[in-house]
Amino acid sequence: MKPLCLSIVAFLFLATLTPALAIEQPRIVPRANEVPKPIDQVFARLKKYFSDPSVSHFQLVSADPKTRTIVAKQSSVDSASWNNWAFCKTGPVEMIYKYADGSATVTVKLEKTTKHSTFVSVAADFQGAYRLGSNENKVACESKFVLEDQIISVAGASDAK
């Protein structure tokens, strides 16, 4: 009888403890695809794209040719682009707030796969500002993967999904 009782207690303990230890899914999930172009060509193309605000509306933050990593940021994202790129999980009170401003920071990592092929990974971090009167709430938002796919297309992928 004692082993049965211990088994039941152990089961109840694990049943209540396990949900508390559940791992939350990451908010920033990278998108990736292979581009049939040499890595130096892809790096130069993306660096030029992010360096020209009239083309991409992004500001180049850094471009490291050694690690083949590019970071760019766009502030003051218009609401049409925002609705296309990201969604924000808010509480019931914040649901009546209106989108006021947002920023998107993208990190592009390149890896050489073959002499004429590059693996491109794009991760986007979205931060939204929502207002109701004088109250403002900043929210870390999740991607719809549209922006990441656009950047992978700019890199030269024929099917950016």
Task: List each model region and its residues.
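Ser/Thr-rich, low-complexity intrinsically disordered terminal regions
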Residues: 21-161
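Bacterial N-terminal signal peptides
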Residues: 7-16
